[in-house]
Amino acid sequence: MIGCAKPLAAPLQAWARPPSPAGRRLPPSFCAPDTSPALTRAVESPGQSQSDDAPPPRSGEAASSLAPRASSHLDRWSRSRALRSGHRPALNRAALSSASVSAPPVIKSPRPEDAAVAAEDGEDDDVCEAERDAAAGKAIYIVSDGTGWTAEHSVNAALGQFENCLADRGCAVNTHLFSLIDDMDRLIEVIKQAAKEGALVLYTLADPSMAEATKKACDFWGVPCTDVLRPTVEAIASHIGVAPSGIPRSFPSRNGRLSEDYFQRIDAIDFTIKQDDGVLPQNFYRADIVLAGVSRTGKTPLSIYLAQKGYKVANVPIVMGVALPKSLFEINQDKVFGLTINPAILQGIRKTRAKTLGFDGRQSNYAEMDHVRQELVHANQIFVQNPWWPVIAVTGKAIEETAAVILGILHDRKQKCSMPRISKRY
């Protein structure tokens, strides 16, 4: 006799109970738990048991009694995959291996009825590109009760350590962001789908009960998982001696009042858009940062990125034969930064830009190498005449990297610290 498996936490126990007979039946190809008698006993509540020689339930009844109600979107993912692949994907149940030894999982073949259901729902190969691409690489599920940007940026930074492998498709990875997951039903659906795809689950859930339920559910279905923020939150709580609130950023009462930081960012973005490309040079004195460089060195996108961080930014194009605004030399020179770039890279960018605008080589010398070099030499002469302007080479740099260099220099000049840093008070 195989004993009952240890029950999960309260939210998961509620899911594991069989629904009422009137409950809705799921489509035949829905990836429900194994329907073997041993696994059926494993999900019963403590104290219940069945004899080993009891007849196994019919597969349709087992799926109906054990499977929870799932969202139509995730359900359709499951059915479309089964129809395309010709079999139902096996579910990784490492946590239940001891309960499923005596009976192998049931693998269903697609039936005409399945195709009929798919036809009714209008499913085809274009239902979900993420589903189709999942077979091309390992899946990473990012689950958050907020926007998920924090976890997504953390994952992107971590994936940067595997660039060589990712570039040659030796270890292809697909990331899938699930944001605003704030109830248990949706959380369970996502984890079940992760189990089907053999995905890694990375989550940022402020509510401790949701985070604990995620860990237990992932253990139950054999899904590898990691809490991205919990170690940091616990370290800060220990350092300042205050317990965390457990309230996600998206919680209504938390967003009831707009912070001063929010209005500062809105004001910075509005200012930056109005000062783009040297417009209104009389307002340069109001800017926190002023960028100068030849065309296509990334002044505008860099300005917008910095504005989203709350900095008012103006940018000035350096053009041969056009004098720079007088106000540029009258403001505090600590906030002026020059941008330069490799001429070959700049030529390639300009060629693409010219093609987009419908220019060709006969109409403009904008993308000619000689002209590109002359402009860069002219800009360098201006930078030499103004040695207090830090000149940053943007070749091969992401906007975030260039912004980090600028902010590091800016804050170091303001604070006169022994070590360069970017400081912010909360």
UniProtKB/Swiss-Prot annotation:
Pfam families: Kinase-PPPase (PF03618). It catalyses: N(tele)-phospho-L-histidyl/L-threonyl-[pyruvate, phosphate dikinase] + ADP = N(tele)-phospho-L-histidyl/O-phospho-L-threonyl-[pyruvate, phosphate dikinase] + AMP + H(+); N(tele)-phospho-L-histidyl/O-phospho-L-threonyl-[pyruvate, phosphate dikinase] + phosphate + H(+) = N(tele)-phospho-L-histidyl/L-threonyl-[pyruvate, phosphate dikinase] + diphosphate. One of its GO terms (cellular component) is chloroplast stroma. Leaf mesophyll-cells. ADP binds at residues 153-160. Residues 1-41 form a transit peptide. It comes from the Eukaryota. Regulated by light/dark exposure. Its cofactor is Mg(2+). It is found in: Plastid, Chloroplast stroma. Its main location: plastid. Optimum pH is 7.8-8.4 for both catalytic activities. It is an enzyme of class 2 (transferase). Its EC number is 2.7.11.32, 2.7.4.27. Bifunctional serine/threonine kinase and phosphorylase involved in the dark/light-mediated regulation of PPDK by catalyzing its phosphorylation/dephosphorylation. Dark/light-induced changes in stromal concentrations of the competing ADP and Pi substrates govern the direction of the reaction. In the dark, phosphorylates the catalytic intermediate of PPDK (PPDK-HisP), inactivating it. Light exposure induces the phosphorolysis reaction that reactivates PPDK. NCBIfam families: PRK05339.1. This is Pyruvate, phosphate dikinase regulatory protein, chloroplastic. It comes from Zea mays (Maize). The gene is PDRP1.
